[in-house]
């Protein structure tokens, strides 16, 4: 008889294979550690990528100030009700950030075309990075997020 037990311990999924020998009735336990993506792991990668994006933007002569990063679930519901966002925003998971980008001439960037080079760079950093300026329904040019697909 073989039984598997699983439990989460920080960022490692531990599997215990428990086998009972039919002849001796002795139980043998084998501990197997398998890497598992966690929200904290994703947040760390997201944060590192945001730093790379800001450095890239600065290297082109632009300045950056931070927009909204964290959003409570309550605030997400309010925004969704007002048509200004969605109720399951990745801001709530700390996997999305809005950036204000200022040109070398001091102009706040607003259009998708102005943000495009930075959005393309963002998406090149990680296969799960998504730039809001590419969305068909209600594009959001200053929005940068990391999809949570790795945990699904």
Residue ranges and their predicted role:
Residues 25-39, 101-103:
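Acidic/histidine-rich, surface-exposed loop or edge segments in extracytoplasmic proteins
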Residues 3, 34, 56-62, 101-105, ...:
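A generic structural signal for ordered secondary structure
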Residues 44-87:
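Secreted/periplasmic proteins that engage bacterial cell-wall peptidoglycan
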Residues 1-32:
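N-terminal secretory targeting signals
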Residues 86-152:
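Catalytic cores and adjacent binding grooves of peptidoglycan-active enzymes
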Residues 35-45, 105-112:
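Second-shell loop/turn segments in exported
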Residues 9-15, 45-56, 100-102, 144-149:
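Solvent-exposed, well-ordered amphipathic alpha-helical segments
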Residues 32-36, 63-71, 113:
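A generic short-segment signal for beta-strand/edge and adjacent turn/coil regions
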């Amino acid at each position: 008889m073989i039984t598997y037990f699983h439990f989460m311990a920080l960022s490692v999924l531990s599997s215990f294979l428990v086998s009972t020998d039919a002849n001796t009735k002795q139980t043998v336990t084998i501990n197997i550690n398998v890497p598992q993506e966690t929200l904290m792991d994703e947040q760390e990668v997201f944060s590192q990528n945001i730093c790379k994006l800001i450095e890239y933007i600065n290297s082109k002569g632009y300045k950056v100030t931070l927009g909204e990063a964290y959003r409570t679930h309550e605030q997400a519901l309010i925004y969704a009700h007002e048509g200004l966002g969605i109720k399951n925003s990745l801001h709530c998971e700390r996997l999305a950030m809005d950036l204000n980008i200022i040109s070398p001439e001091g102009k706040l960037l607003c259009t998708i075309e102005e943000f495009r080079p930075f959005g393309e760079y963002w998406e090149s950093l990680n296969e799960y990075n998504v730039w809001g300026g590419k969305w068909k329904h209600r594009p959001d040019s200053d929005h940068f997020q990391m999809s949570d697909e790795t945990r699904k």
